[in-house]
């Protein structure tokens, strides 16, 4: 079992295991499940993601027709994707244990920031990175999201949440590429995670999903709220 990213790295080095294998083994131990059951469970989650993607138009392209459909060209196998999902899950589990993954607890840094770190770690795995690369990718992604407030307009998870998700996704790709280029995080990932916890604790409640501050209290947000009230 592990309680930090460094724990995972140490296990990988001591037992000659891959990052994803350590996470899968922990899942098996926690749920008293055999390897096949753990794998099937993760495969089902991946399938659910692919099924959700089917609602989008696969032929959709940019106005010029030069952009779109590039994800399909990467050609990763289901096995590679599931390995990456285990990696992402491992990072997420550590963040959840040592900090938070809820905006109501730690601000949006705990939601989109955590998701971005998880995605960056998974992307590094897909690119064949080492366990150390994975750790740096997660650290670099999360550092860029520290201090992000959770200030949804009208308390709805729409504005500015949807746009911030895009920023988190791009941040994850960038962080993974930086890590794969050999750039390291000056602050270890576990310390970055703890920093997120401390920042979240220092945040006022108005910036923790209460719609009591930030963008949720702008004049335009007030007008949007009035419009909703008229519809009730």
Q: For each predicted feature, which ranges?
A:
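Phosphate/pyrophosphate-binding betaalpha-module
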Residues: 64-147
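Generic N-terminal targeting/processing segments that precede catalytic cores or assembly contacts
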Residues: 1-66, 182, 189-232
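Catalytic cores of large soluble enzymes that bind and process phosphate-bearing ligands
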Residues: 34-44, 73-76, 80, 160-164, ...
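Functionally critical mobile loop/hinge segments
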Residues: 116-232
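A short glycine/serine-rich beta->alpha loop
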Residues: 54, 58-63, 102-110, 156-163
């Amino acid at each position: 079992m592990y309680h930090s990213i460094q724990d995972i790295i140490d296990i990988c080095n001591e037992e000659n295991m891959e990052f994803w294998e350590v996470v899968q083994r922990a899942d098996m131990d926690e749920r008293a499940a055999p390897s096949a059951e753990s794998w099937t469970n993760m495969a089902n989650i991946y399938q659910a993601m692919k099924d959700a993607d089917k609602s989008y138009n696969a032929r959709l392209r940019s106005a010029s027709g030069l952009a779109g459909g590039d994800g399909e060209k990467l050609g990763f196998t289901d096995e590679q994707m599931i390995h990456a999902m285990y990696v992402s899950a491992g990072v997420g589990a550590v963040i959840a244990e040592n900090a938070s993954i809820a905006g109501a607890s730690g601000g949006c840094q705990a939601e989109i920031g955590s998701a971005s770190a998880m995605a960056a770690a998974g992307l590094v795995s897909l690119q064949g990175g080492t366990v150390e690369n994975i750790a740096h990718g997660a650290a670099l992604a999360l550092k860029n999201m520290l201090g992000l407030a959770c200030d949804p307009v009208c308390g709805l998870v729409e504005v500015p949440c949807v746009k911030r998700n895009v920023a988190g996704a791009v941040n994850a790709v960038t962080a993974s590429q930086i890590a794969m280029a050999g750039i390291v995080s000056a602050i270890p990932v576990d310390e970055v995670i703890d920093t997120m916890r401390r920042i979240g604790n220092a945040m006022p409640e108005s910036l923790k999903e209460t719609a009591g501050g930030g963008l949720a209290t702008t004049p335009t947000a007030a007008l949007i709220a009035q419009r909703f009230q008229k519809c009730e």
